[in-house]
Amino acid sequence: MPVLLECLSHTPLSGYCDPAPEVVAEVGRIHAAARARVADFDPQLVVVFAPDHYNGFFYDVMPPFCIGASASAVGDFGSLAGQLAVPADLALDLAQAVLAADVDVALSYRMQVDHGCAQALEILTGSLDRYPVVPVFINSVAPPMASCRRARLLGDALGRSLARSGQRVLVIGSGGISHEPPVPELAGATDEVAERLIAGRNPSREARAARQARTVAAARAFAAGDSRLHPLNPEWDRAFLKLLEEGQLPALDGFTDSAITREAGKSAHEVRTWIAAFGALQAYGPYRATLDYYRPIPEWIAGFGAMHARPIAETA
């Protein structure tokens, strides 16, 4: 059955630390075109692969992958808040299909997602609940993480099940490429920070505002060239995007955590969401992909990209 893939970078900094107006407008046009494709496709189901930034998943139990059978968005950085329209029975069926394919995945009936998921849904569909949606969390910031190969196999297992569903499916991959915003790490953390990373759910409004202010300040310093954060790496980004565009997904299996961190920054591990999304698409057969946009945007601390793809059989 028909499938459409949309992969895009997200940023919590939009509206807080923006690049030049012409760049904001440029990104807006790319998003509008993607939104029009989705509206024309009119999906019956959305599956969104997304990371989390210590807003919904913590070290008390940190799964490598988790499928949401019920989910709500926390509304960080002004992103949409509220309940996602998750078909619980279908989410459970998908989890069972993934496990049957020998890929270990957790299941949550109380998943919380942040801007990493909600922003993509807002950009592409206009809301959290316009279409039935199954969120799939991929741990991308909290070591240890599943390998890129396992992310691909997760996507493949989901894609094979979705291809048998008889539905028009929109597959979304939401994540940054090269980037390293100021995300805290458990290793070497103070007791206070460690506790927040282990069990920091539902912070106070003041705590969330303070975290937001730190991130915005870091972005302004980064854009001004006064930062120790890892620089953006357009060369690495373009090489990664080219592998996706050419359908060379197995080549991504060899991407190691240490190499990703060294070349593209500690949050570039979010490329696992793109890998999983393309893995799901490739389960439908060979595909044709288009790189719609790429630009390094220091103000958003992001190598910012967007791609869409369809199976070749559906584009002939």
Curated annotation (Swiss-Prot):
Alphabetical list of InterPro entries matching this protein: DHPP/DHXA_dioxygenase (IPR023789), Xdiol_dOase_suB (IPR004183)
Catalysed reactions, semicolon-separated: 3-(2,3-dihydroxyphenyl)propanoate + O2 = (2Z,4E)-2-hydroxy-6-oxonona-2,4-dienedioate + H(+); (2E)-3-(2,3-dihydroxyphenyl)prop-2-enoate + O2 = (2Z,4E,7E)-2-hydroxy-6-oxonona-2,4,7-trienedioate + H(+)
One BP term from GO: 3-phenylpropionate catabolic process
Annotated Pfam families: LigB
EC number(s) from the headed UniProt entry: 1.13.11.16
Listed GO MF terms: 3-carboxyethylcatechol 2,3-dioxygenase activity; ferrous iron binding
Pathway(s) it belongs to: Aromatic compound metabolism; 3-phenylpropanoate degradation
Coiled coil: none
Catalytic machinery residues: H115 (proton donor), H179 (proton acceptor)
First and last residue of the signal peptide: none
Cofactor: Fe(2+)
Keyword Oxidoreductase: yes
Top-level taxonomic group: Bacteria
Assembly behavior: Homotetramer.
Described purpose of this protein according to its UniProt entry: Catalyzes the non-heme iron(II)-dependent oxidative cleavage of 2,3-dihydroxyphenylpropionic acid and 2,3-dihydroxicinnamic acid into 2-hydroxy-6-ketononadienedioate and 2-hydroxy-6-ketononatrienedioate, respectively.
Family indicated by similarity: Belongs to the LigB/MhpB extradiol dioxygenase family.
Protein name: 2,3-dihydroxyphenylpropionate/2,3-dihydroxicinnamic acid 1,2-dioxygenase
